[in-house]
Amino acid sequence: MTYVVTDECVKCKYTDCVEVCPVDCFYEGEREDDFMLVINPDECIDCGVCVPDCPIGAIKPESPGLIEWVERAKDFIENKGWKNITKKKTALPDADKFKDEKDKFNKYIGSVKIAN
C-alpha cells in the first residue's frame, strides 16, 4: 500500500507534507510552477504521517478508486523526470483561488498522458 496525492493538490501545491515524511518520498516537476506534488509509491512506507499536514486533504490512502493517481505518480517520476522534494516551499501563487475547485486535473492537466 501507499498514499497518493490527489486532485485537490492540482494548481495549489502546498508542501507542508514534505517536511514530515520520514522517507522523503514526495516529488515535483523541475519548474517552479509545476502543478502538483506526487508520492513515489515504491518509496512510501504507508505511515500516513503526511495526511494531517496537508491543508487541503489531498493525501489519501491508496484504494481501488485512486489507482490512476498511483500510475500518474509513477509516470511523472519515471518518464517525466520529476525530482525529490524534502523542504517546504511556498504554495503556487493562486493556490487559495483553486483550493476548493473540483476535477482540476482533467480541467487543467488532462493533456498530460500516462506513458505506456
From Swiss-Prot:
<dbReference type="InterPro" id="IPR022569">
    <property type="entry name" value="Fd_C"/>
</dbReference>
<keyword id="KW-0479">Metal-binding</keyword>
<keyword id="KW-0677">Repeat</keyword>
<dbReference type="InterPro" id="IPR000813">
    <property type="entry name" value="7Fe_ferredoxin"/>
</dbReference>
<protein>
    <recommendedName>
        <fullName>Ferredoxin</fullName>
    </recommendedName>
</protein>
<keyword id="KW-0003">3Fe-4S</keyword>
<feature type="binding site">
    <location>
        <position position="17"/>
    </location>
    <ligand>
        <name>[3Fe-4S] cluster</name>
    </ligand>
</feature>
<feature type="binding site">
    <location>
        <position position="50"/>
    </location>
    <ligand>
        <name>[4Fe-4S] cluster</name>
    </ligand>
</feature>
<feature type="domain" description="4Fe-4S ferredoxin-type 2">
    <location>
        <begin position="35"/>
        <end position="64"/>
    </location>
</feature>
<dbReference type="Pfam" id="PF12838">
    <property type="entry name" value="Fer4_7"/>
</dbReference>
<dbReference type="InterPro" id="IPR050294">
    <property type="entry name" value="RnfB_subfamily"/>
</dbReference>
<dbReference type="Pfam" id="PF11953">
    <property type="entry name" value="DUF3470"/>
</dbReference>
<dbReference type="InterPro" id="IPR017900">
    <property type="entry name" value="4Fe4S_Fe_S_CS"/>
</dbReference>
<dbReference type="GO" id="GO:0051538">
    <property type="term" value="F:3 iron, 4 sulfur cluster binding"/>
</dbReference>
<dbReference type="GO" id="GO:0009055">
    <property type="term" value="F:electron transfer activity"/>
</dbReference>
<feature type="binding site">
    <location>
        <position position="54"/>
    </location>
    <ligand>
        <name>[3Fe-4S] cluster</name>
    </ligand>
</feature>
<feature type="domain" description="4Fe-4S ferredoxin-type 1">
    <location>
        <begin position="2"/>
        <end position="31"/>
    </location>
</feature>
<feature type="binding site">
    <location>
        <position position="44"/>
    </location>
    <ligand>
        <name>[4Fe-4S] cluster</name>
    </ligand>
</feature>
<keyword id="KW-0411">Iron-sulfur</keyword>
<feature type="binding site">
    <location>
        <position position="21"/>
    </location>
    <ligand>
        <name>[4Fe-4S] cluster</name>
    </ligand>
</feature>
<keyword id="KW-0408">Iron</keyword>
<keyword id="KW-0004">4Fe-4S</keyword>
<dbReference type="GO" id="GO:0051539">
    <property type="term" value="F:4 iron, 4 sulfur cluster binding"/>
</dbReference>
<dbReference type="InterPro" id="IPR017896">
    <property type="entry name" value="4Fe4S_Fe-S-bd"/>
</dbReference>
<dbReference type="GO" id="GO:0046872">
    <property type="term" value="F:metal ion binding"/>
</dbReference>
<keyword id="KW-0813">Transport</keyword>
<comment type="function">
    <text>Ferredoxins are iron-sulfur proteins that transfer electrons in a wide variety of metabolic reactions.</text>
</comment>
<keyword id="KW-0249">Electron transport</keyword>
<feature type="binding site">
    <location>
        <position position="9"/>
    </location>
    <ligand>
        <name>[3Fe-4S] cluster</name>
    </ligand>
</feature>
<feature type="binding site">
    <location>
        <position position="47"/>
    </location>
    <ligand>
        <name>[4Fe-4S] cluster</name>
    </ligand>
</feature>
